[in-house]
Amino acid sequence: MSRATAVSRLARAARAAAAARRHHAGGRDPLRALASLAGDASASAGGGARRPAWFAPPMGRLGGGGLLVPPPPPQRRLFHPTQAARYSTSSSSQITPGEFTEMAWEGVVGAVDAARMSKQQVVEAEHLMKALLEQKDGLARRIFSKAGIDNTSVLQATDEFISRQPKVVGDTSGPIIGSSFVSILDNARKHKKEYADEFVSVEHILRAFTEDKRFGQQLFRDLKIGENELKEAISAVRGSQRVTDQNPEGKYQALEKYGIDMTELARRGKLDPVIGRDDEVRRCIQILCRRTKNNPVIIGEPGVGKTAIAEGLAQRIVRGDVPEPLQNRKLISLDMGALLAGAKFQGQFEERLKAVLKEITASNGQIILFIDEIHTIVGAGAAGGAMDAGNLLKPMLGRGELRCIGATTLDEYRKYIEKDAALERRFQQVYCGEPAVEDTISILRGLRERYELHHGVKISDGALVSAAVLSDRYITGRFLPDKAIDLVDEAAAKLKMEITSKPIELDEVDREIIRLEMEKLSLKNDTDKASKQRLSKLEADLESLKQKQKNLSEHWEYEKSLMTRIRSIKEETDRVNLEIEAAEREYDLNRAAELKYGTLLSLQKQLEEAENKLMEFQQSGKSMLREEVTDVDIAEIVSKWTGIPVSNLQQSEKEKLLLLEDVLHKRVIGQDIAVKSVANAIRRSRAGLSDPNRPIASLMFMGPTGVGKTELGKTLAEFLFNTENALIRIDMSEYMEKHAVSRLVGAPPGYIGYGEGGQLTEAVRRRPYSVVLFDEIEKAHQDVFNILLQLLDDGRITDSQGRTVSFTNCVIIMTSNIGSPLILDTLRNTSDSKEAVYEIMKKQVIDMARQSFRPEFLNRIDEYIVFQPLDTTEINRIVEIQLNRVKNRLRQQKIHLQYTPEAVEHLGSLGFDPNYGARPVKRVIQQMVENEIALSVLKGDFKEDDTVLVDVSSVAIAKGLAPQKKLVLQRLENANLELVAND
């Protein structure tokens, strides 16, 4: 080309820039003029005469000092999703969003932003590559990953190339399309036709980069990826699908995006071992091998191990321990959350799910789908008339084209799946029950190694047994083995935290050093002799403490390093075991033998040496850390969860049962026969001799008022379940009307209160281990006894919402005042001993009960216990108990209370009334002791640290009459006075 021609081109460029400026001034978009300018450049570069090497692409008008262009209007870009960009080529084609997929068009628009951020005016191929690589979850990144190329290295190479390109500083007229950008899009159109697609997609653009001599070819050479490798990666990602809409990228590798390969996790050893559940796994395999409706659904309570059954199946598939129809299959867990997330427009969710189902169908039965919480497919994606996931799955589930395993809880299965009969019949139920305590212990033993490896601690077998037993008894509302596993996990985490934290001994020394250092700074300013002596002594103490701190730190670091070393060896051993399993599966016996008899033996020897070193250090007495989880740790965690004292949890069950009478008699005075009957019923249950399908015991307490019937129920609740709150008290005087009976099990549908549950059923559902006390049962309406019949016989009640509430872990106590006059008259009119009279009196009282209660109700009660009236000796013991309670309350006011035996007898005589039992005693103490002490405290007669004596004095009334006793309160001068019966 001659110099005159070149000057002519420059003049035309200046005129185009001026036209763009005029368009800008008139409020019109300069896009077409700039695009035409780029088109001229590409035309001259492609089909015209050859440009000299010094000729730069026209970028604007020619100025005196260089190329000057007016700035573009704010917030304007070369490509806008709603605008078309025209460039002049031999085909005079046009860039429109309608010919690109959404992700490809985002890349085209993003290339302009990449150029602007790089301060470059010409948008070239490298900017397009950068935009495609920066797309989150973009198709370009997935294709490069599939080809084995690190996306970071591709982006880094692209950035380096961009940084070498010339930058434009100062005012510019906006970005311009470069020739390489144009050729990339042209070649992408050709590849679109090659694939018989309807839209230009990201993979077409990547194929076009292999023909770009300016940037793309060199990039792929540096990455060592050829065109064939790129085509294979694209085929692996998109499979056999065609681009028929503008969002095909979301459907590529749908299973990989929206599913988790459980067989791959099992192959890599990422799944926990599954202990037991062989029957359930075998049943699932049996259903999966059917011709049609080969879809098991695992139902059970939350935490019993439904997902673990699917994991166990995945592990068996990897091991080859399955029938031929399931050999070498993949078990994919569908992530419904990922499937729904980001589906903004109607139809997107259905497209994703159809893509997943299409991949499963294309696998010809090689893929088994697992949907955890399968009830979520009912209604999922159904909005504005769209079909939900359940309806999309139904045809394939029925024909056997899709083998699907579901898992859900009983309540959600009933609430969602059973309502859709067409969906329910396509699934076959596999019930997963709660394992027994013995099975839970086996499961924990199987999981122990995994938790030891994760936390870097040891877990004793006693801790596992304790976790299963204590969780089964005290943690209600959850199910085994989940709650037992959580106990072990939390106890191990607590111990690990203690190991990594500073030991208490070292922490105390550190704090003491800080305190002495501060005291030393304070003493340095004093010049008196005592301060100097104190300073010298303090410096000596500091020196000693710092030496101790150094020794303790060294011991701690050494012990911690040994534990870390043991943990790393165990992790390496676990990795080697996985490699051995993989080698044996692939029949690489040389590799397996090398690992098993070489590497593994070496690791075991290293582990033994490290453990011996740790044991020697611990036996030397220098150890500051604990590495084993024991049953005490488990009991502490249970105590934190439930509030039950640790000492009660650790006390053996046998010891507690043997001492049952003594414990009950601490609060229940007298009533030896009643206490013994209750203790025998509880021991019978705990020994496993009672019916497991009935309550622990159902007892009826009959006797006069105030003799300890309700108190025995409270004491029994505290003994059995370590808290008095475990007593559920139902006052039957509130259920005298017929309409009030429904409050026990909940209001029926249509009535106010439906859905809130019943007072009895909800209380037992929340606290299954409890004592249920029906107080004054004879006052209840007759319909109440109809409810109690099934409770006493079957140990269960169905509430108003159809939920079955179990009473098999409850003690049922009913109190009644029937026969009270008979009991009092019998004892008052006989001189025989209580034991001799008891059986006759009991028979007479039961005969009276038969007149009030129906035979079918009385026949279901385990034992009738008749309480006897209290005598003076027992009343005096109750007085002592009540005075000790007053004493404890006064202790909070820092006032000490003591009393004499005479005072106890006097109060007992005043409060004794066989007709009213022990209740008058409380009133007498309240009037004669508590009122007087309160008055004296307010007057100032009794102050803090005073000792108050409750005594009796004799008062003469008149000559010839015996003096009367009077209760007196006096402040003791000598607080050390020895008195009897004060504790």
From Swiss-Prot:
Induction comment: By heat and oxidative stresses, and abscisic acid (ABA).
GO biological process terms on file: cellular response to heat; protein refolding
Subcellular locations according to the entry: Mitochondrion
One annotated GO molecular function: ATP binding
InterPro entries on file: AAA+_ATPase, ATPase_AAA_core, Chaperonin_ClpB, Clp_ATPase_C, Clp_N_dom_sf, Clp_R_dom, ClpA/B, ClpA/B_CS1
Region (Repeat 1): 100-165
Transit peptide: 1-87
Domain called Clp R: residue spans: 97-240
Entry keywords, A to Z: ATP-binding, Chaperone, Coiled coil, Mitochondrion, Nucleotide-binding, Repeat, Transit peptide
Cystine crosslinks: none
TM helices/strands, residue ranges: none
Coiled coil: 504-627
Region listing for Repeat 2, in residue ranges: 177-240
Major site of localization recorded for this protein: mitochondrion
Region (I): 255-503
Chain segments carrying region II: 629-820
PANTHER family named among the record's database cross-references: ATP-DEPENDENT CLP PROTEASE (PTHR11638), CHAPERONE PROTEIN CLPB4, MITOCHONDRIAL (PTHR11638:SF86)
Functional summary from the UniProt entry: Molecular chaperone that may not be involved in heat stress response or tolerance.
The family this protein is said to belong to: Belongs to the ClpA/ClpB family.
Name listed for the protein in its UniProt record: Chaperone protein ClpB3, mitochondrial
Organism in which the protein naturally occurs: Oryza sativa subsp. japonica
Lineage of the organism: Eukaryota, Viridiplantae, Streptophyta, Embryophyta, Tracheophyta
The gene coding this protein: CLPB3
